[in-house]
């Protein structure tokens, strides 16, 4: 393994991401919306309305919970939480948990699409093929160039979200309650796996399309399972709890390994050369 060559490709790809506004904006906007804007809007806005007396949310029956969550889900997730804190805890612990997975997924897929399909569209793929690296090293470099930023953004966002969650919920909860074991598993077990799976899918997709736009359009379908998880949880079909999240992470890692093995075939020089 020629590590200097691997890191040279990683640095080149990261520099391209920083220069490319079309890639840079989604990397910033997605975590800000999910991990900052939504908590402030849903929890901060609810606390403000409650304190002003405009909307009573001190009981589950008078809160927005009945309109967004299945009663069985409420019983399983927040039955032990004081009534005044149920809305805040539900939003921060339950509702936003599946959406958090969109952060590493979007970051990984956006960078991967630019790294693979973008190289072909910009006409820089041919030069890359002439670098003194083996196919395995090229695959590793491309993987690290997207996976490392994805988990960095996911973990930095998790840290910011943890502080923000405790600040927003303090008026009703009255203590530091976050992060929970479920969220720790999401951040450090599932998020890296989701990033790897997104990368594997984008490698497969990018090997079969010629434009960055096409890669984005097809690759965007990978967010659908996350949306289905959110709907299933709100419907009471499942609840993100430690054992389920641990098992889900294992499944995602297995799928990611399979996708990356399939995608590795798309990065062989002879196949890339035929698609220039």
Q: What are these regions, as identified by a protein language model?
A:
Residues 103, 108, 135-162:
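Selective transmembrane-helix segments that form parts of the transport pathway or gating/packing helices
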Residues 55-59, 86, 160-188, 237-240:
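Membrane-interfacial helix-loop-helix connectors in multipass membrane proteins
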Residues 19-25, 115, 174-223:
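A structural motif at transmembrane helix-loop-helix junctions in multipass membrane proteins
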Residues 48-107:
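Membrane-embedded or membrane-proximal helical elements that form or frame transporter/channel pores
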Residues 208, 254-276:
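Junction motif at the cytosolic side of a transmembrane helix
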Residues 1-11:
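Short, membrane-interfacial amphipathic segments enriched in basic
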Residues 4, 19-52, 71, 95-108, ...:
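Hydrophobic alpha-helical transmembrane segments of multi-pass membrane transport/permease proteins
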Residues 17, 108-127:
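Transmembrane helix boundary and interhelical loop/hinge segments in multi-pass membrane proteins
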């Amino acid at each position: 393994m020629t590590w200097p060559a691997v890191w040279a490709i990683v640095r080149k790809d990261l520099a391209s991401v920083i220069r490319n506004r079309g890639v840079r904006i989604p990397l910033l906007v997605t975590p800000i919306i999910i991990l900052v804007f939504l908590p402030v809007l849903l929890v901060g806005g609810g606390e403000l309305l409650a304190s002003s007396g405009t909307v009573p949310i001190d009981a589950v029956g008078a809160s927005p919970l009945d309109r967004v969550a299945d009663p069985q889900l409420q019983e399983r997730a927040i039955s032990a939480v004081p009534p005044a804190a149920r809305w805040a805890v539900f939003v921060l612990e339950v509702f936003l948990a599946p959406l958090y997975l969109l952060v590493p997924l979007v970051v990984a897929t956006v960078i991967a699409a630019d790294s693979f399909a973008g190289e072909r569209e910009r006409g820089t793929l041919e030069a890359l093929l002439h670098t003194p690296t083996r196919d395995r090293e090229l695959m590793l470099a491309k993987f690290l160039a997207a996976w490392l930023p994805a988990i960095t953004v996911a973990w930095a966002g998790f840290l910011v979200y943890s502080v923000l969650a405790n600040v927003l919920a303090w008026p009703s909860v009255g203590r530091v309650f976050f992060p929970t074991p479920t969220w720790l598993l999401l951040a450090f077990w599932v998020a890296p796996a989701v990033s790897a799976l997104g990368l594997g899918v984008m490698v497969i997709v990018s090997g079969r399309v010629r434009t960055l736009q096409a890669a984005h359009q097809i690759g965007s379908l990978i967010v659908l399972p996350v949306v289905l998880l959110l709907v299933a949880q709100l419907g009471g079909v499942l609840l993100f709890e430690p054992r389920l999240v641990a098992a889900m992470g294992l499944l995602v890692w297995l799928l990611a390994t399979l996708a990356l093995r399939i995608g590795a075939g798309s990065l062989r020089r002879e196949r890339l050369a035929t698609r220039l």
